[in-house]
């Protein structure tokens, strides 16, 4: 049996971020074998999960699922730290199965989803094990489920953009709508659905531009209103020019096809997540200073 030295305990702690006493116990159980001790901690403490939990997850994958009858569907975003892991087969399988689980079980939120049975354990134990296996933090960010008497369509672009659409009409219309939404990324179905904060921000910019133009107050007011209305047309699905025929709007296309859309969900991986940027020059300088 190898001697359990302080240096060995320290090395194991640095690798796993496990408590010092747990590291010592694992090394004792492993008879001083560092690799075996690390495996023991992986099983006991979820491996690197605790260490990885503080790291930013801004990459990831969008999972989509529609039931065989086409009446229930779900879209989910699961994040990881790097694009490399987003292409890992185990990660992809985890995300796609989660989408199916959401559609089938209709959990209230991420916490409820995490407690559901999954494989030989729960969603959370599976996630933790995957963190240990892959070595990156993995987080379930958001999901949405739709159940409808009508029809559902979906589209995923490169695993990073996912769309789920509830509609009534021919199957081709649903596919066209999903692809259009992925391409143009509307904020809402119509003007009523656009967030007040987004409209206020656009109005503020328009007012500043109008003030700088030096135009009379009445003309400036019309300029502001015109800018806001243009913005709403650009970000609302029904008002957008249809991507397959920009001479008609999406609303006109739907009317022509005798179809309608009730709602849509659009997820873009990492949208709104602040990514950590590394200043490598500063990092190297700090490392050099530490060795000075």
Curated annotation (Swiss-Prot):
It comes from the Bacteria. One of its GO terms (molecular function) is translation elongation factor activity. The keyword Cell wall biogenesis/degradation does not apply. It is found in: Cytoplasm. Transmembrane segments: none annotated. Belongs to the EF-Ts family. PANTHER family: ELONGATION FACTOR TS, ELONGATION FACTOR TS, MITOCHONDRIAL. Associates with the EF-Tu.GDP complex and induces the exchange of GDP to GTP. It remains bound to the aminoacyl-tRNA.EF-Tu.GTP complex up to the GTP hydrolysis stage on the ribosome. This is Elongation factor Ts. It comes from Bordetella avium (strain 197N).
């Amino acid at each position: 049996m190898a001697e359990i030295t302080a240096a060995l305990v320290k090395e194991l702690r640095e690798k796993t971020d496990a408590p010092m006493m747990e590291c010592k116990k694992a090394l004792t159980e492993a008879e001083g074998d560092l690799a075996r001790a690390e495996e023991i901690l992986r099983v006991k403490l979820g491996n690197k999960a605790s260490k990885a939990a503080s790291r930013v997850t801004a990459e990831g994958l969008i999972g989509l699922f529609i039931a065989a009858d086409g009446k229930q569907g779900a879209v989910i975003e699961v994040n990881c730290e790097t694009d490399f892991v987003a292409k890992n087969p185990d990660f992809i399988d985890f995300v796609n199965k989660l989408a199916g689980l959401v559609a089938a079980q209709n959990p209230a939120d991420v916490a409820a989803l995490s407690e559901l049975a999954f494989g030989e354990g729960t969603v959370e134990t599976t996630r933790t094990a995957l963190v240990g296996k892959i070595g990156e933090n993995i987080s379930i960010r958001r999901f949405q489920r739709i159940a409808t008497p009508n029809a559902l369509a979906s589209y995923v672009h490169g695993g990073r953009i996912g769309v789920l659409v509830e509609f009534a009409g021919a199957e081709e219309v649903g596919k066209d709508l999903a692809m259009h939404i992925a391409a143009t990324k509307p904020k809402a179905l119509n003007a009523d659905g656009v967030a007040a904060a987004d409209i206020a921000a656009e109005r503020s910019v328009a007012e500043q531009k109008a003030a700088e133009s030096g135009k009379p107050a009445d003309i400036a007011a019309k300029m502001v209103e015109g800018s806001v209305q243009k913005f709403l047309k650009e970000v609302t699905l029904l008002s957008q020019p249809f991507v397959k025929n920009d001479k008609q709007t999406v609303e006109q296309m739907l009317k022509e096809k005798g179809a309608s859309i009730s709602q849509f969900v659009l997820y873009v991986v990492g949208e709104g997540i602040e990514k950590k940027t590394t200043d490598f020059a500063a990092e190297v300088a700090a490392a050099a200073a530490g060795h000075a």
